[in-house]
């Protein structure tokens, strides 16, 4: 669609336009640039929606779009029917059948500060004649937009957003997403046919694990949860979609019919009530965190609150959505061709930025994997200064053609590691240098190899200092033995001082020596000693996970722990025996088998036992008071974190599951419970208990 030369011209124009302010442009100046500005925006739409290869950040795109809007607002005679402000960009690739939405699936107008929100409120009040407006405020999910249609209580069609008028029909793919009910009793609300809008998401922790597994296997990483979700719902095979841990949140009813009449604004009068109804029907919705605000000041306060706590939310959100709550006002407020006038998005700080690669260094991981890391010109992304980013492996570098000196688009989503989305090749000067992989380990100088079928180079020396340090860091980490005070920096310091060389050395530390190390006082040494002693009591699965067996994550570690009485029992398992355990294939089984048939590893486990680290289940733990019972949690607990509650249940022999099903024995309900409560009530087989009853059940276990 665009030649390389034209793309370079448009990139150059992009950065020129980003410096402009519509308020300072005369009509003649605006007239000269407006068509080029439209072309620049169309170009970026094409890069984003069709190629999925943006060359600017979302924030920069929004600035360009706002510049065009402001110019057209100042000089309406410059508006053309084909202007990007008059339509929604398309993402259709014609892989799936195209279907027309019942109502247009428009974008939202964006705001970035209090002034924008107050301006929105002023316009709403002027058009409605109200002194104070009631707004609903909810998180703006950063996922893949979908539209769902239910007829006579059955889910009959699902589609992507597409160009807003026409989307791609992906019903079969959406049917495998468990948070989309295949039927819902809309008829009890007098609704025959309904169209619902939503977003497909991947929870941040599951996305992180997905990328960690792909990184370990040398597969290309997903840039962010949104890209992973958008790509997943458009896979050709629904069974593959089902493996991706997708969830769907619905956030709006756009059409509700009874006897051919639309009930919105008459029978269904308030947006917040509609979301509550969807919530009660078993859909996943923002209802638990939605707030109805009277006046714009309450709205601003709630948006600021969420900007502070955004990273604590389980899903990636990029802002808040503010809607006029009274649906009967929507006709009066109306629409532009791009967005409704009764809603606006308040966007959080940008998560993407462009910067330059200064250099590339090579780091060695605990399994010997050698990872190239780009050192960047420091850049602020989402309130955090980013100065380095993993380049994954040689294949990733070659595929994206990354070079030292390149300008790159970097994204940092929530607690997800920074990621190079793409190289801005149009910004190259000719001075960029190819990245050369080392021939030997950068830590110990040993030869490096690239095993058949793998994308990563590995150091073959298991005593390589970098590998040893990374194994120690992993062992002490929160998800493993959780040794507070034994940070990465402390481990490196202890290693350099020759205080630790192996995992058992952690339990042989000379605390009298540590007292003399700068930065360690009597109190910090005492705290470290207590934390190390406490770690000896951790559940068996944490020890297995902490040993750093390749491909063995937390879930697989739990599977192994539940299959044995003591860790030594694992040396008696053949590869075939291991493959009979849930979710363990040949590759993982081979790594486990090799680990427990390595004499050095068996010697290490024996040393840990002699140092009184728990290597067996205690009988009461294996057959604890909660043995065989499955728990699910919903809402916020006062007594402790969800992670701590999970740890207690597992220490007493129980299991904690993510979703409600007939396998679940107890649903523990905290404050602001989600849709799991309705599902449990609907099933009728799950015992629903509150926090107080849960505490009685666990019988005085320490929740701190």
Swiss-Prot record:
It is an enzyme of class 6 (ligase). Keywords: DNA damage, DNA repair, DNA replication, Ligase, Magnesium, Manganese, Metal-binding, NAD, Zinc. Its EC number is 6.5.1.2. GO terms for molecular function: DNA binding; DNA ligase (NAD+) activity; metal ion binding. CDD domains: BRCT_DNA_ligase_like (cd17748), LIGANc (cd00114). GO terms for cellular component: cytosol. Zn(2+) binds at residues 441, 444, 459, 464. The keyword Transmembrane does not apply. NAD(+) binds at residues 58-62, 107-108, 138, 161, 199, 323, 347. The active site is at 140 (n6-amp-lysine intermediate). It catalyses: NAD(+) + (deoxyribonucleotide)n-3'-hydroxyl + 5'-phospho-(deoxyribonucleotide)m = (deoxyribonucleotide)n+m + AMP + beta-nicotinamide D-nucleotide. It holds the Pfam family Nlig-Ia. Gene3D superfamilies: 5' to 3' exonuclease, C-terminal subdomain (1.10.150.20), 6.20.10.30, BRCT domain (3.40.50.10190), DNA ligase/mRNA capping enzyme (3.30.470.30), Helix hairpin bin (1.10.287.610), Nucleic acid-binding proteins (2.40.50.140). GO terms for biological process: DNA repair; DNA replication. Its cofactor is Mg(2+); Mn(2+). DNA ligase that catalyzes the formation of phosphodiester linkages between 5'-phosphoryl and 3'-hydroxyl groups in double-stranded DNA using NAD as a coenzyme and as the energy source for the reaction. It is essential for DNA replication and repair of damaged DNA. This is DNA ligase. It comes from Sulfurihydrogenibium sp. (strain YO3AOP1).
